[in-house]
UniProtKB/Swiss-Prot annotation:
Minor protein of the capsid that localizes along the inner surface of the virion, within the central cavities beneath the L1 pentamers. Plays a role in capsid stabilization through interaction with the major capsid protein L1. Once the virion enters the host cell, L2 escorts the genomic DNA into the nucleus by promoting escape from the endosomal compartments and traffic through the host Golgi network. The gene is L2. GO terms for molecular function: DNA binding; structural molecule activity. It comes from Canine oral papillomavirus (strain Y62) (COPV). This is Minor capsid protein L2. Residues 249-258 have a biased composition (Polar residues). A motif (Nuclear localization signal) lies at residues 1-9, 504-509. Residues 229-269 are annotated as: Disordered. Disulfide bonds join C18-C24.
Length: 513
């Protein structure tokens, strides 16, 4: 069996990756680091042989220092020398001109040799005086005897400074310093479409501000300045009419003139996708209900994937969505009719191979949203007789159902009721109230709510005949004024005692003191 040699990547691609991990092959490492046999020969051979003047491997193609010489001929007599640098004169710092000279009078050869002092006056100098010391000190006077020096006597002439006086003031010739003139330029460009401020104090240099000069006159009736009428710079520009036109032909807030409806072109490829128009509006809100049963835990904005076995024969709720395993998220665009179209791509799985792979065609499902019709306008009518209400002050509300009864407040047929029937019935609301008396720190007294009835003597029905005397004694009909419950309010201990009839019957007897 012949072995196939696989091609390896370029050395410049292998070297950066293998250098980090130190796993580079020897040939790639030597080639990239210039350590091959040829590189070693050039390194060691260049140490003993100098080939610098021949221009080998320089890549310039000039033939070394001497250049190329044609075969069978001689070198040209004209040689290219070095480039001569041209020296330009420098700009003088100051202007060059004739200096200022002091005029000098010509000397008369026949005149006197001694120049009179009036021609050139001499300044008068003050005699030299020694100033007093700043800090005077006390000096003791000593007498010093001067003795002549033995020998021949000699006289020392005394010479002082020559003083010349003149009554005229001194004249000094002062030569003014000459400086070269300076030129200061200022450029200013005005932009009529941009104003920075009313006044501009910009210095030298370019500026977009313009100076405005305001001239005010105090004599009334005079117009200062010039009136320049403005003209249209673009007379060919079309004029706009001031009338307002109501345009309702467009269906969007920012209509585009002459623009075609943008829709995905790949969806309408009939050779690739089957075009299926859906008429059920559930396709927009709940597309899953067209394929399988509803599941509330899903999101319509993502792709819908339906897991089903191809071998199982399951009918879809909608015939067009049979064998659909996936529906993409909705795409909104404009249809040919101008309505909004909602599109989804569906993948069918109606073919299953032996390897278990399910394949099938793809379909383009689209639904055109219908236009919204304008709302119907209903004319509102006034309720009741408006004219009669304005005149008589009554308003009658009538209903067509007949469930209401019309009642006139001015009709005297209404029955009159007595005042006694209108009086409220008195209700005894304080019948079962109990009075609880006690101090703040003591617990309230709980009294039994229901009083146990007690029997009178010879209770029953008795017939009394008038004018006859009864043989037996009858108790008085007037009830006893003794209360059943006696509460002593003045006693701080809040003690009480019950009526003997309220005491439960026991074997043990109670004694009251």
């Amino acid at each position: 069996m012949a072995l196939i040699r696989k091609r390896r990547a370029a050395p410049q691609d292998i070297y950066p990756a293998c250098k980090v991990s130190n796993t580079c092959p020897a040939d790639i490492l030597n080639k990239m680091e210039q350590n091959t046999l040829a590189d070693k020969i050039l390194k060691y051979g260049s140490a003993g042989v100098f080939l610098g003047g021949l221009g080998i491997s320089t890549g310039k193609g000039v033939g070394g220092r001497t250049g190329y010489i044609p075969l069978g001929g001689t070198e040209s007599g004209v040689g290219v020398g070095t480039r001569v640098t041209t020296i330009r004169p420098t700009v003088p710092i100051s202007s060059v001109g004739s200096p200022d000279f002091i005029p000098v009078d010509a000397v008369d050869p026949l005149g006197p040799a001694v120049i009179p002092p009036e021609r050139f006056p001499i300044a008068v100098e003050d005699p030299f005086t020694l100033p007093p010391p700043r800090f005077p000190t006390a000096v003791e006077e000593d007498v010093i005897e001067l003795q002549p020096i033995p020998g021949p006597s000699s006289e020392i002439p005394l010479a002082g400074p020559k003083i010349t006086t003149d009554a005229q003031p001194a004249i000094l010739e002062v030569i003014p310093e000459t400086r070269p003139p300076k030129v200061i330029t200022r450029h200013q460009y005005s932009n009529p479409a941009f104003e920075v401020s009313i006044t501009s104090n910009s210095g030298a240099g370019e500026s977009s501000a313009s100076d405005h000069v305001l001239v005010e006159g105090f004599s009334g009736g005079h117009s200062i300045g010039e009136h320049i009428p403005l003209q249209d710079l673009a007379p060919s520009r079309p004029s706009f009419s001031e009338t307002i036109e109501d345009e309702t032909a467009f269906s969007s807030s920012t209509p585009k003139q002459g623009s075609r409806s943008e829709r995905p072109k790949s969806y309408y490829n009939r050779r690739r996708y089957q075009q299926v128009q859906v008429t059920d509006p559930v396709f927009i809100s709940r597309p899953r209900s067209l394929v399988t049963f509803d599941n509330p835990a899903f999101d319509e904005s993502v792709d819908l994937i339906f897991e089903r076995d191809v071998a199982e024969i399951t009918a879809a709720p909608h015939a067009d969505f049979t064998d659909i395993t996936k529906l993409t998220k909705p795409a909104y665009h404009r249809g040919p009719s101008g309505h909004v179209r909602v599109s989804r791509l569906g993948h069918r799985a109606n073919i299953k191979t032996r390897s278990g792979l399910t394949i099938g065609p793809q379909s383009h499902f689209y639904y055109d949203v219908s236009s919204i019709d304008p709302a119907e306008s209903f004319e509102l009518q006034a309720l009741g007789n408006v004219s009669s209400a304005e005149q008589t002050g009554e308003a009658v509300i009538s209903s067509g159902t007949g469930d209401f009864e019309i009642i006139s407040l001015e009709d005297s047929i209404l029955e009159s009721y007595n005042d006694e029937d209108l009086i409220d019935v008195f209700e005894d609301v304080a019948r079962d109230l109990h009075l609880l008396v006690g101090e703040r720190r003591q617990q309230p007294i709980q009294v039994q709510r229901y009083i146990k009835p007690f029997s009178f003597v010879n209770e029953g029905v008795h017939i009394i005949h008038p004018g006859s005397e009864s043989d037996f004694w009858l108790p008085p009909v007037t009830p006893d004024s003794t209360p059943a419950i006696v509460i002593d309010i003045l006693d701080s201990s809040a003690d009480y005692y019950l009526h003997p009839s309220l005491i439960k019957k026991r074997k043990r007897k109670h004694f009251f003191f």
